[in-house]
C-alpha cells in the first residue's frame, strides 16, 4: 500500500484541530487552569463531573463496575467507596510529569496533548480501566511493592447485563436492612446471555476460554487451626470447588470436591495484610484457604461468595431474615474483617436432611470431640433432632450413625470441670455418660441449651401423648416401636465399642441404676454385675453370667478366652456374629507378627485374591463355581484383612485355613489347565529367563506393591529397583529433562541410558 502524502490528509487535521480548540475553550470557561513552570494542570472537575453524571443517570450499578473483569462490593462504607472512585482515573501528579517533559516549541499536536488528554481518558476509560480488584488497587498511592497481579481470572462479564442493572443509589435504599459489612452483588457470569455479545470496543467475536471454570489458581488449604497447610491447585466451577494435589512431576490429581450448596459462611479474615479465606460448611466443619497475596485472597472470597450466592435460589428472598439472625457475626470495621454469612436454612438440601424419619427435624449439627475409653478426644459429627442425638464419622453423614441416644431419656446436661476446660460438658443418659468438648465455650453453651431444650420438649410431648391416649389399651401405645427404638439405641452403642477394650466407670456414672432395666442396684438394692464387653453394670435379671468371646480382647491381645457378658451384649454379639466388621490391618496390624494362625490365614487369603482375578476373567461358569464354594463370605476373596467374629473363632479353632486351602487347590488347578488363564502369566524382568510366573505362587515369586509386576523371589531380594516402575517414571519426565541430557526424543534411547545394574541369573 502506498504511503499518503501530507497534502492528502491536511483537511482532516484542520477539522480535528478546530474540534479540540472548541473543547479546550469550554474547559477554560469552566475552570481557570493554573500554569506551574510551564506545566498545565489537569482540571479535577472533568473526572468527578463525568463520574457524577454516570452515577446520576444510573448507567452503572456501582463504582466498581468501571472495572472490566471483576465486581467489587457495593454495600460498604462511604470512605472506602470514595477511595475507589478517586482511583478510577490516573493520578493527577502522574499526568503532570508526563506532560512536563514536552517543550513549549513543539508542533501543534504536541501543544494540544495536555488539553486533549482528559477527553481521551474519559472516552477510552473502558480500555484503560482496571480488569479486577487487584488492578484497581495497583493505581493507588498506598500500593505496596511486590504485589503480583492475579492471572487466574477467566470470568467474562456480559456488559449489557451490567449496564442495565439498577444504579447504586437505588440498590442501597432497598438494602438498608442488610448486613453491615461488605456485600457482593449477584454474579452476572451465571446469567443467560445471547450467543453474540458486543463488548466495550464493539467486538462481537468474544469467546470464553474456560466456560465452566470461573476461577482457578494455586492455593494452600487446611481444615482447621490444628492441621497443616497443604499446597494444591483449585478450580471454581458454578456448582463445585475442586482441589487437585500436585505430585513431584507437577501432575494434578483430584484431591477433594466441595459442593457450593454446603457452604454456610464465607469470611475474609484480618485486615489489608490478610491472606486467608475462612469458610464454614453445613456440619460446622471449617475449610481455610490461603492465597499468595492479600488481594488474591480477597478476590477468591468474592468469587466464591458470588457463586454460592447464585447456587442457592432462595437466598435472595431471605436477606431480610438473615440480617436479624442471631447466628451471624457482626464486625465493626468492614475494611478489616470482610465477613459474609449465609443462613443455613436457605441452602439447598444437605445430606443430613436426605435421610429417613429419624434424621428429619434437625435442631443442631456440628463437630464435637468425645472422650473415649483410651482417654483421648476423638472428633465426631453430632446431629441433634427432636427425638435423637446421633454421632457420625466426620464427613460420612450418609452412613449409619455410630452412636444414637433417645433425647427423652436424657437425665442431665452439665458442665464438665474435670479437665479444667471451659468448653467441656457432660450429657448423662441411663446407659452411658457422654463427655463432650466443643471448640469454644460459646459453642459448648449453645449445644447445652439445645440439648436441654430438645429433652424438655421430648418429655413434654410424651406426657401430652400419654394424657391424650389415657383411655386406650397399653398395646396401642406403640410399645413395639418404643422397644425397637431402644434396641436400636443399644445396638449402635455396642457397635461403637466393638473393638474397644472396656473399662469399668463405676456405679456413680450410672447413678446406681441398671443399664438394662433402670432398676436401682448397688449397696442394699442388689448386687451389681459388670459386663466384660461394655463395662456397664447390670442387675441379676439382666446379667445371668452368659459367656462369649470379646472381639476387642482378640484384636488387641489375642485373648481367645470367653468372658461373662450381659443379656444385651450377648444378644448383640450373636446378631453381628457373622458380619465382617473387624479390620485387623486398621485396628492392630502388628497382630500378624504375634499370632501365627492369623498370619497363615492372611497369606492364604492373599493367594485366593490373586486367583480370583484369573477365575473372574474366565468363563462365567468358572466364576460362578468359585463364588458358590466361598458363599456367603465373598469378602474373603476381596478384602483380605476383614474378619467376622465367626472367622476369628474358626482361626482360633484351626478350621479356616483348611477351608481356604481347598478353595485354593480348586482355583490353582483350573489356572494351570485352562488355555485362557494359563496364558496370563508374567516374565521376570530382572533375569529374563523366560519362565512363566503367577502371582499366587507366593513361595517362589515376589510381587511389586506399586505396579503389580511379578519377579523371582531370589531376584527381588537383591534390592534391585523394579524395572517397570523405573520405566514408568522415565516416561513421565518432561522434554526439558531430556534436552538437558542431550538425548533425542526417542523413548527407547532415553530409557537405555538408565540401565539397571544387577548380576545375571
Curated annotation (Swiss-Prot):
A zinc finger (Phorbol-ester/DAG-type) spans 669-722. Pfam families: PH, RH_dom. GO terms for biological process: myoblast differentiation. The modification Phosphoserine is found at residue 132. InterPro entries: DEF8, PH-like_dom_sf, PH_domain, PLEKHM3_PH_1, RH_dom. It is found in: Cytoplasm; Golgi apparatus; Cell membrane. One of its GO terms (molecular function) is zinc ion binding. Keywords: Cell membrane, Cytoplasm, Golgi apparatus, Membrane, Metal-binding, Phosphoprotein, Repeat, Zinc, Zinc-finger. Widely expressed. Expressed in C2C12 cells (at protein level). The keyword Flavoprotein does not apply. One of its GO terms (cellular component) is Golgi apparatus. Residues 212-309, 361-456 form the PH domain. Its main location: cytoplasm. Interacts with AKT1. Involved in skeletal muscle differentiation. May act as a scaffold protein for AKT1 during muscle differentiation. This is Pleckstrin homology domain-containing family M member 3. It comes from Mus musculus (Mouse).
Amino acid at each position: 500500500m502506498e504511503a499518503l502524502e501530507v497534502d492528502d490528509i491536511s483537511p482532516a487535521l484542520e477539522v480535528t484541530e478546530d474540534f479540540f480548540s472548541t473543547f479546550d475553550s469550554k474547559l477554560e470557561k469552566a475552570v481557570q487552569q493554573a500554569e506551574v513552570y510551564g506545566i498545565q494542570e489537569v482540571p479535577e472537575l472533568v473526572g468527578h463531573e463525568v463520574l457524577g453524571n454516570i452515577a446520576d443517570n444510573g448507567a452503572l450499578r456501582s463504582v466498581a463496575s468501571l472495572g472490566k473483569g471483576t465486581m467489587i462490593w457495593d454495600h460498604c462504607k462511604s470512605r472506602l467507596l470514595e477511595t475507589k472512585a478517586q482511583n478510577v482515573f490516573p493520578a493527577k501528579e502522574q499526568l503532570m510529569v508526563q506532560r512536563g517533559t514536552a517543550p513549549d516549541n513543539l508542533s501543534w499536536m504536541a501543544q494540544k496533548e495536555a488539553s486533549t488528554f482528559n477527553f481521551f481518558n474519559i472516552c477510552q476509560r473502558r480500555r484503560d480501566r482496571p480488569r479486577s480488584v487487584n488492578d484497581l488497587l495497583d493505581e493507588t498511592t498506598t500500593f505496596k511493592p511486590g504485589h503480583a497481579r492475579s492471572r487466574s481470572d477467566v470470568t467474562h462479564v456480559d456488559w449489557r447485563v451490567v449496564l442495565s442493572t439498577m444504579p447504586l443509589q437505588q440498590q442501597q435504599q432497598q438494602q438498608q436492612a442488610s448486613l453491615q459489612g461488605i456485600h457482593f452483588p449477584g454474579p452476572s457470569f451465571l446469567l443467560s446471555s445471547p450467543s453474540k455479545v458486543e463488548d466495550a470496543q464493539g467486538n462481537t467475536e468474544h469467546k470464553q476460554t474456560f466456560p465452566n471454570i470461573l476461577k482457578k489458581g494455586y492455593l494452600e488449604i487446611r481444615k482447621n487451626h490444628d492441621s497443616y497447610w497443604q499446597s494444591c491447585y483449585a478450580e471454581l466451577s458454578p456448582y463445585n470447588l475442586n482441589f487437585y494435589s500436585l505430585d513431584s512431576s507437577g501432575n494434578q490429581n483430584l484431591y477433594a470436591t466441595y459442593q457450593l450448596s454446603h457452604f454456610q459462611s464465607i469470611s475474609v479474615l484480618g485486615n489489608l495484610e490478610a491472606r486467608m479465606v475462612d469458610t464454614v460448611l453445613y456440619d460446622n466443619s471449617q475449610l481455610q484457604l490461603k492465597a499468595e497475596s492479600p488481594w488474591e485472597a480477597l478476590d477468591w472470597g468474592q468469587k466464591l461468595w458470588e457463586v454460592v450466592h447464585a447456587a442457592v435460589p432462595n437466598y435472595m428472598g431471605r436477606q431480610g431474615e438473615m440480617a436479624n439472625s442471631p447466628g451471624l457475626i457482626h464486625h465493626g470495621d468492614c475494611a478489616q474483617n470482610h465477613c459474609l454469612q449465609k443462613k443455613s436454612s436457605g441452602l439447598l438440601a444437605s445430606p443430613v436432611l436426605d435421610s429417613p424419619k429419624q434424621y428429619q427435624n434437625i435442631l443442631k449439627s456440628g463437630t464435637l470431640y468425645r472422650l473415649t475409653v483410651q482417654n483421648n478426644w476423638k472428633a465426631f459429627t453430632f446431629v441433634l433432632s427432636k427425638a435423637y442425638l446421633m454421632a457420625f464419622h466426620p464427613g460420612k453423614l450418609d452412613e449409619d450413625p455410630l452412636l444414637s441416644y433417645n433425647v427423652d431419656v436424657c437425665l442431665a446436661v452439665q458442665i464438665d470441670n474435670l479437665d479444667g476446660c471451659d468448653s467441656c460438658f457432660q450429657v448423662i443418659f441411663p446407659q452411658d455418660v457422654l463427655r463432650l468438648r466443643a471448640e469454644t465455650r460459646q459453642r459448648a453453651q449453645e449445644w447445652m441449651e439445645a440439648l436441654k431444650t430438645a429433652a424438655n420438649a421430648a418429655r413434654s410431648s410424651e406426657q401430652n401423648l400419654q394424657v391424650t391416649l389415657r383411655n386406650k389399651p397399653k398395646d396401642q401405645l406403640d410399645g413395639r416401636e418404643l422397644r425397637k427404638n431402644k434396641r436400636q439405641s443399644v445396638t449402635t452403642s455396642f457397635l461403637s465399642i466393638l473393638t474397644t477394650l472396656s473399662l469399668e466407670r463405676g456405679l456413680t456414672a450410672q447413678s446406681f441404676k441398671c443399664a438394662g432395666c433402670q432398676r436401682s442396684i448397688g449397696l442394699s438394692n442388689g448386687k451389681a454385675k459388670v459386663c466384660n464387653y461394655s463395662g456397664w453394670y447390670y442387675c441379676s435379671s439382666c446379667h445371668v453370667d452368659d459367656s462369649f468371646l470379646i472381639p476387642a480382647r482378640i484384636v488387641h491381645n489375642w485373648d481367645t478366652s470367653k468372658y461373662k457378658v450381659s443379656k444385651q451384649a450377648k444378644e448383640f454379639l450373636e446378631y453381628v456374629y457373622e458380619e465382617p466388621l473387624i479390620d485387623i490391618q486398621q485396628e492392630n496390624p502388628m497382630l500378624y507378627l504375634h499370632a501365627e494362625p492369623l498370619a497363615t490365614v492372611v497369606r492364604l487369603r492373599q493367594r485366593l485374591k490373586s486367583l480370583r482375578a484369573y477365575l473372574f476373567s474366565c468363563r462365567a461358569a468358572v466364576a460362578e463355581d468359585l463364588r458358590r464354594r466361598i458363599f456367603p463370605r465373598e469378602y474373603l476373596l476381596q478384602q483380605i484383612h476383614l474378619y467376622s467374629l465367626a472367622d476369628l473363632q474358626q482361626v482360633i479353632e484351626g478350621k479356616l485355613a483348611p477351608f481356604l486351602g481347598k478353595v485354593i487347590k480348586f482355583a490353582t488347578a483350573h489356572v494351570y489347565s485352562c488355555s485362557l488363564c494359563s496364558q496370563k502369566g508374567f516374565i521376570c524382568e530382572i533375569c529374563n529367563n523366560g519362565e512363566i510366573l503367577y502371582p499366587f505362587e507366593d513361595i517362589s515369586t515376589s510381587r511389586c506393591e506399586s505396579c503389580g509386576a511379578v519377579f523371582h523371589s531370589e531376584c527381588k531380594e537383591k534390592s534391585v529397583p523394579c524395572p517397570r516402575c523405573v520405566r514408568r517414571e522415565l516416561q513421565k519426565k518432561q522434554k526439558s529433562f531430556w534436552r538437558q541430557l542431550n538425548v533425542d526424543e526417542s523413548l527407547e534411547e532415553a530409557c537405555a541410558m538408565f540401565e539397571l545394574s544387577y548380576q545375571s541369573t
